[in-house]
Amino acid sequence: MKAIESILADAASIAAMRRDIHAHPELCFEEQRTSDLIAKALAEWGIAVHRGLGKTGVVGIVKNGSSTRAVGLRADIDALPMTEHNRFAHASTYPGKMHACGHDGHTAMLLAAAKHLARHRRFDGTVYLVFQPAEEGGGGAREMIRDGLFDKFPMEAIFGAHNWPGMAVGQFAVKSGPCFASSNEFKITVTGRGSHAALPHNGIDPVPVACQMVQAFQTIVTRNKRPIDAAVISVTMIHAGEATNVVPDDCVIEGTVRTFTLDVLDLIERRMKEVAEHTSAAFGAQCAFEFHRNYPPTINHEAETAFFRRVAAEVAGVDNVLEFEPTMGAEDFSYILLDKPGCYFLIGNGDGGHRAGGHGLGPCMLHNPSYDFNDDLIPLGATMWVRLAEAWLAK
């Protein structure tokens, strides 16, 4: 894949911005410094700037010609609450905070594209550059929408992307339909009656009740839904008791549920509640069932996915546009795709041929304390953004 020459010429300066962002990571809705950097750069390049959506979100507006057509390009900007292990010059300077998912690179790619689009304006219409906060659990996309993102900036479609370690630089991957799962959490408090461990018959032990629930939950996946409908119920925490010779009053179970469709999610939530309540009753215990729906599934729209495939094949070559298998990870671009047609795609962050977090042992996976974004990707990702915008708003 060949990057646009003017973007290549700016690659070093944009990479320096990326490393500055990496060194100063900010968590959900705290991205004030990052937003200031983005807004300042956009303004210097003659791009109109709107701030405040989703607290720390930034929207750049690039117009050309007379068309009322518009398209959106989105990058997330927040970091993770992690301690970085890297020791290079641009490692995090904020203890307990790190850009371990590459949002610094996503921001840099969209900034590079913004600079080129503002300089050359080879399109007819409006490009909205959406720099979104709080993707990592904060639902920043939802908050920007609630604050009027699509009312203030009416766009026909919107595209989002994520770097993908292990996939070669210059390769892209996409899938029509469900591609990322919904993310949901549950908490079940089983209440029995405490007793001496030597006299369990005098109490109601909540621990075996909880154990029965954990096993029964897996039969929801294997026996209550269709085998072709993917779902995962993961019990990740069980807490009970404070002393070895005491049967506790309570046992708390917590975990996550992930599905690709809301119908399956509805089924699982209903059946988990039934299993929890009926199992507790069978043992003479009581339970409090809590289920929190976080991110919905990310479902790419067919027409926009086909459009991306066509443009990506022209830019990167058909052999470098891959189909990726759905993942049970979650992404809050899902909220955007509930409101607007669009497509979310992956960009190869390298298969071992880059710095790889400084250890030189191959690419680090996302959310790894030795991860680093591959700067070689910046001009390629920016080129893809530019070509998507120009193709959507072709003169």
Where are these regions (language model features)?
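Histidine/acidic-residue-rich, glycine-tolerant segments that coordinate divalent metal ions
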Residues: 58-59, 80-82, 86-98, 104-105, ...
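Metal-dependent amide/peptide-bond hydrolase catalytic core
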Residues: 211-395
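Acidic/His- and Gly-rich active-site-bordering loop/insert found
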Residues: 1-99, 104, 108-111, 115-123
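Hydrophobic face of alpha-helices
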Residues: 14-15, 28, 35-39, 110, ...
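Divalent metal-coordination and catalytic microenvironments
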Residues: 21, 60, 73, 103, ...
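A structural signal for isolated positions on well-ordered beta-strands in alpha/beta enzyme cores
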Residues: 50, 128-130, 288
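Non-cysteine beta-strand/loop elements that form the S-adenosyl-L-methionine
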Residues: 74, 83, 186, 345-349
